[in-house]
Amino acid sequence: TLIYENQKTITITLKEDQKELKDVVVIGYGTTTKKDATGSLQSITTKDFNKGSIVSADQLLTGKAPGVRITNNGGQPDSAPNIRIRGGASLNANSSPLIVIDGIPVDNTTPAGVSNPLSLINPNDIESFTILKDASAAAIYGSRASNGVIIITTKKGSSGAPEFNYSSNVTTGKVGKKIDMMNGKQFTNFIQTYHPSLTNSLGIDDPSTAVIDDLSTPEVEGRILSNTDWQDAIYRTSISTDHNFSAKANLYGKIPFRASVGYTRNEGLVKTNDYERLSYSLKMTPKVFSDHLKIDANAKGIFTNKNAIDEGGALGGAINMDPTKPIRDNSSTNRFGGYYQDFVLDGSGNPTNTISGQYNPVALLMQRTRPERAVRFLGNIEFDYKMHFLPELRAVVNLGLDASEAQIKERFSNNAMATYRVINSGADYVFNPGKNYEENQTMTNTTLDSYLVYTKSLNGFLTKFDIQGGYSYQNFKNDGNKEIYRYNETTGVREVLPNDNNPNNRYYNVLNLQSFFGRANFDLTNKYLLTLSLRADGSSLFREDKRWGYCPAAALAWKL
């Protein structure tokens, strides 16, 4: 202990200084703070996102938002999720929420070959999600928001020093739990015990002997029995990689921008099920005219490529296929590329195209290809102008384009059982490989939103209010052709299935949506909040006298 003279005691008291952070959240056609929000909404930002190998945006949200249930109904890397906000217990009903990306409502109808609309945006470009859960919060988007709204905001540029970021991860996956099935020996014992007359159908014929099974012996004579785990035969340990690079800076000290590029390769748990995605994005947010005009320009592009499998046939076959049958049959009489097929013989002992059991699930995967490719561009530019003569008044115009092209080509290999058909003579069976299905599609979604916002702070009973009104226009076009190929018993070849009502096999449809909307927010004595909104939606789907519908809403809140 050190003691020095003239020691004094000094008492220091820290004065409490409360500063409330403005927790800004994005809502329909604007922003607010959480404390001023009247509707039920939730904001989820990057710090809350799920980590790991993320293929689509919905995987960032899974399990993160109370009242939001996200389930997958397929094993493919880009399988479409079922998203339900506050209920909607049906897994199959069309109860999907409206998706809004940087102010542009996107169509839940995906391009051909794309299962999940949220897989067409790079998850690494997302800054936040705002989920509008109740009717009052979502009503500003009208009838399409009846199942809730998910607003996606992408990352912005930097106003400071340049920043560069690269991230990469490699993940592996495997089937957590297979269905418990009998192995070859157990299945053989089952047949011997309960269906002894069928023992000569087990396995495959032993070409080295003409003996048939003697039911009085415990062994199965004259048959070669395998012990095939068909689930192991179609599943694999998957390896997936994800690479992302981004750069953000402030060009000339006036134009914050962010650019990114990403590459994802995802192997499905089922063999031959592969998915690739290449993405890019560019965002600029300059301010001009003494910060009176804010510009938000976005451009995002996605290229996807996947091989879609016959998931139902392969998975079902792996459960139902006889475990005493082999995967491969390399005998000289095999006609199916070395894959075993359990076919029915004709009167001459030749194989027909009729399956007596299940298609070989491995052959279903290996002898069929279905490349599905899609290209998508999503861009918009928003002008937010604060009037020089009246700073409380803002005019906002948002122009957007969502355009995509897609192509699907399904083909069978030369010895695929699925192409094995009898020719017109009824005596000979031949293979008819080649095209089975082809589709080309173009989709566009053009958007225009324009509205005025007046905001004013006052002293007295009415503390603050803002009023806005505007017009929204969206036009959807879907143009494509779909060709289905079938075996022609007269010509003996695969050719396009004729359609007298649509000789060109083309489909084309246009949907036009126009809306007027308004909203008023009132802050009374800085304690009570009142929100009133109304939207009128007009759709070209309905006849002229029934085209318009109205969505009014009101909400009242009390600040605690």
Regions found by a protein language model. Name each.
Residues K254-F257, D291-I295, L390-L393, G460, ...:
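Repeated loop/turn-to-beta-strand initiation elements of outer-membrane beta-barrel proteins
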Residues T154-K156, A249-L251, L282, P286-V288, ...:
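Residue-level signature of outer-membrane beta-barrel architecture
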Residues S159-S226, L269-N273, S279-L378, V396, ...:
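Surface-exposed loop/interface segments of Gram-negative outer-membrane beta-barrel transport/assembly proteins
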Residues E544-G549:
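Short glycine/threonine-rich loop-to-helix capping motif typified by GTGT followed
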Residues S168, V261-R265, L530-F542, L560:
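Transmembrane beta-strand segments that form the barrel wall of outer-membrane beta-barrel proteins
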Residues P81, G148, P162, S168, ...:
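Hydrophobic, lipid-facing positions within transmembrane beta-strands of outer-membrane proteins
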Residues T1-V288, L293-K300, L378-G379:
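Short, small/polar-rich motifs associated with maturation and membrane association
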Residues N398, G470, R519-N521, S533:
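Exposed, low-structure sequence patches enriched in small/polar residues
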